[in-house]
Regions:
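Juxtamembrane/start-of-transmembrane alpha-helix segments at the extracytoplasmic/lumenal side
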Residues: 316-336, 399-403
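Alpha-helical transmembrane segments of integral membrane proteins
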Residues: 336-626, 630-637
Length: 858
């Protein structure tokens, strides 16, 4: 028989899992009948439909962004709020993206009427990525801010003034938030902030980030809300990732506060499916309700003289928040470790436990943890080989994640069966119990050193286990129900703190989270191995066979359902790339799964396997030859160069003659450029793959961008590239072939034009008296003269130079050098019958014995 203890344990696991699932579902959306002082999801959705009903993407600086901005200003005016626009300044992110955001700023007075009163900021961003309309990220938050303003005005003013910031450029690198925090007069009075964002289109709203000294903040939050979903592991894990929101800027400014987001429907994030049809009113309502309560609590609190200190914290099924001060939790974890050793040692001395058996049980638990890690990674490899999961580096989200989540849960069940079977031969019940308690206490002590905010995970069940270990000290035999009850009590405490992590784990990390899920369950469920060990041979066999069957069914189900669907699509980018230096053009497809859909290969001669998108981008890309379109390439003009203390300095001007939406300058690794100066300020460049670095300008002005930099090496390659967020008309055939289960994402489908040239800053720039501008295909003829002097302006593209004269003399590569801004480089001109194909990028000079250059006429 299975055994009552094991059956009760399985029922307990199922009940706690269902309770966690229910807690992490957003509540029913509130309707228009909601009292005026409360947040109404229905009213917020009406505002959202009015703001982005046209469904157009609105990236920073776009015409659509200007239209949306005007609508937001109109809504604020209807609410009696007088917004101001913060404009005009160039801002760059920490990863080399620059733009000129336009922020919407307003102030709601508080009862503290002093001009320098401490204020609370309420923030959201109104820009979207170029690929999608951003209904949830972050249009829903903008609508929520407007609904919160309406609800605030239904009550008397708050104690502290509230500053509204609806900023632009978050998607481009938190540009609007940086501009506000650095330059707006109201920023100096802000002491706390509430930020709203989304990394999906649905799901429960989570408090995933707070200010630094957050013990008082969590206390404030716990008292303000009746339903709270948060824990300090979210906060700790988020700090270890490269992701950032506007709240990252606010934290860096020293402001306290709360950062809310929902992450359900993450497969639609930053795609065209982030639209009104997929925006969940329940998520909007829950996030708005939480933000309103948190904002009112902050606006009534003491923002300066609050108690210091951070806390570890977690919610209990969304009904309450348990707070543990970190200053006390660290010594408490070490004390627990000492108590676990002491109680276990006392039990050994009294003969209740056998030390070798406890050590053997500990080895079994450690081995199961290692095996869970190895087994999880192996299962990922197998599922990738079966094409159930995308390859490493691809999109980590699939359409039916429940299949693989079930498989990894079953894998952890097999580890439990293994623990119980081996432990039955090497130890008894209390010896395995003591080993579990020692493992939990040791893990808590280690986490207290390295990740203290996560140390509560093993500490809570560890405390329960050490207290229960006092029971066998009486020296009497305990009935079976006492032993089973002891194991299930600790199991309940372990699952209560662990399941809130397991539920959103996949949504946060995708496929890489699956082995972590298995390990987390193995670390949380060893207490279930105790009644399993006592279940009898038939019970253990039935449990092992059942979990193996679940694993098999999950894998078969994963094989039978599609990896991607129209509702949870693969992210696939299409690009038209024109290399003006080489005179080549390509259709490029970048599938996030790293696999090229067959329909494209059938239509065009795409490369057989993926290759890196560029020397600075490892994204897997497939290319096919495309027609060369008459697109003006971006221009680099070298204004000055000289020796500097760092190495070599230069001043440049970048221009996009075709007025592209983005303009970038990339430096080869030997340059070692790490900062550029634009508008008198120094900004960091992005450090890319292969040692390349870049600076990128969004919506650059028509006359271009002037910048300066310092490089270590005097000579290095640079690439100037501009980009638009659409494909040329000739790409229609590719767009029609796009599979239904794929969508563009992030920047969307793009057209890029690039030129590559070599700069040598050790030479003086060449004066430009003999310069002309040539368009692609222009024929330029010279008078008959060998070794004619020629100068070509940087704005020219690849062209053809026809010379009337001894072509072999003029184009003898052994005697001819081209120069770019005065720099001697390898020859770029190759003789081709009676003409030469020249890379007309930069300023070229062909030395001539003639005293006067021959005139050149088109």
């Amino acid at each position: 028989m299975m055994g009552r203890g094991l059956a009760a344990g399985l029922v307990l696991c199922a009940a706690l899992w269902l309770a966690s699932l229910a807690a992490y579902q957003p509540p029913r959306a509130s309707g228009p009948e909601t009292p005026p002082e409360e947040f109404s999801a229905s009213r917020a959705m009406d505002v959202l439909r009015d703001l982005i009903g046209d469904g157009r993407p609105h990236p920073i600086g776009s015409a659509a962004a200007a239209v949306l901005r005007a609508r937001i200003v109109q809504h604020l005016a209807r609410l009696g709020v007088e917004p101001q626009l913060q404009t005009g300044a160039l801002v760059c992110s920490d990863w080399g993206r620059c733009g000129t955001p336009i922020n919407i700023v307003a102030r709601l007075p508080g009862t503290d009427s002093a001009a320098d009163a401490d204020s609370v900021l309420l923030a959201a961003h109104y820009d979207s990525v170029p690929a999608g309309p951003g209904a949830s990220d972050d249009g829903a938050s903008v609508a929520a801010v407007l609904e919160i303003v309406r609800a605030l005005q239904a009550r008397p003013p708050t104690r502290h003034p509230i500053v509204l910031l609806i900023d632009e450029g978050e998607e481009a690198g938190l540009l609007g938030a940086r501009l506000f925090a650095a330059r707006h007069p109201l920023a100096r009075y802000v002491k706390a902030a509430v930020n709203l964002d989304a990394r999906g289109t649905s799901g429960a709203s989570l408090l995933f980030e707070t200010g630094t000294d957050n013990a008082w903040l969590i206390g404030l939050y716990a008292h303000a809300l009746t339903r709270a979903l948060t824990n300090s592991v979210y906060y700790t894990a988020y700090q270890l990732t490269p992701h950032a929101t506007d709240f990252s800027v606010f934290r860096a400014a020293g402001w306290q506060g709360f950062n809310f987001a929902y992450i359900g429907g993450v497969a639609r994030y930053h795609t065209p499916l982030d639209d009104l049809a997929h925006a969940d009113p329940r998520s909007v309502g829950q996030q708005g309700t939480q933000a309103l309560a948190a904002l009112r609590a902050l606006a009534a609190a003491e923002l300066i003289d609050h108690p210091p200190g951070a806390a570890a914290y977690f919610d209990v099924f969304g009904r309450m928040i348990v707070r543990l001060p970190l200053a006390a939790l660290r010594p408490a974890a070490w004390l627990l470790w000492a108590l676990a050793i002491g109680v276990s040692g006392l039990l050994v001395r009294r003969g209740v436990l056998r030390l070798p058996a406890v050590a053997a049980a500990g080895a079994v638990l450690l081995g199961a943890g290692v095996l869970a890690c190895c087994g999880g990674e192996t299962l990922v490899v197998v599922l990738r080989a079966l094409r159930v999961l995308p390859l490493a580096g691809g999109n980590p989200f699939i359409a039916h994640p429940w299949t693989v989540e079930l498989a990894f849960t079953a894998l952890s069940g097999l580890m439990l069966a293994l623990i119980a079977e081996i432990a039955r031969h090497v130890c008894g019940f209390w010896e395995l119990f003591a080993a579990c308690a020692l493992c939990a206490a040791t893990l808590a002590a280690l986490l207290a050193l390295w990740l203290p905010a996560a140390s509560y995970l093993p500490w809570v069940p560890g405390v329960c286990a050490v207290l229960i270990l006092l029971v066998p000290l009486r020296g009497r035999g305990e009935p079976a129900w006492v032993r089973d009850g002891a194991a299930l009590l600790v199991l309940a405490s372990a699952l209560t703190v662990a399941l809130p992590l397991c539920i959103p784990l996949y949504l946060a990390l995708g496929v890489p989270a699956l082995p972590v899920l298995a390990l987390t369950l193995v670390c949380s469920l060893p207490w279930l191995a105790l009644p399993l060990m006592r279940a009898g041979r038939i019970g253990r066999a039935a449990f092992a066979a059942g979990t193996a069957m679940v694993l098999g069914v999950a894998v078969i189900a994963a094989l039978r359902v599609p990896v991607y669907t129209a509702e949870a699509p693969e992210r696939l980018g299409m690009r038209y790339e024109l290399d003006a230096t080489a005179g080549q053009a390509f259709w490029t497809i970048v599938p996030d799964s790293t696999r090229l859909p067959a329909v494209f290969r059938e239509a065009m001669a795409f490369t057989g396997g993926p290759a890196p998108l560029a020397p600075w981008s490892p994204l897997p890309a497939y290319r096919a030859v495309a027609p060369r379109l008459a697109l003006d390439p971006p221009v680099l003009r070298l204004l000055s160069n000289q020796r500097s203390q760092y190495g070599w300095s230069a001043q440049l001007r970048l221009e996009s003659p075709r007025g592209a939406a983005e303009l970038a300058l990339l430096f080869s690794p030997e340059s070692a450029v790490r900062r550029v100066r634009v508008g008198g300020e120094a900004w960091p460049v992005a450090v890319l793959a292969g040692g390349w670095s870049s600076i990128e300008f969004l919506n650059p002005p028509p006359d271009g961008v002037a910048l300066s930099f310092e490089a270590v090496a005097p000579a290095f390659d640079v690439v100037v590239q501009d980009q638009d967020h659409f494909l040329p008309a000739q790409a229609g055939v590719l767009e029609r072939l796009r599979p239904a289960a794929t969508v563009p994402w992030q920047n969307g489908d793009v057209t890029t034009v690039s030129t590559r040239l070599r700069l040598d800053l050790a030479h003086e720039p060449m004066p430009p008296p003999y310069a002309l501008t040539a368009q692609p295909g222009t024929n330029m003829r010279t008078a008959a003269a060998p070794m004619t002097a020629v100068a070509i302006q940087p704005s020219t593209m690849i062209g053809r130079l026809t010379v009337n004269g001894p072509i072999t003399d003029l184009l003898d590569a052994s005697r001819m050098m081209t120069t770019i801004s005065g720099t001697a480089t390898t020859p770029l001109i190759t003789a081709l019958q009676n003409s030469a194909r020249i890379g007309l990028i930069g300023r070229y000079w062909i030395p001539s014995p003639a005293s006067t250059p021959t005139a050149i006429t088109p």
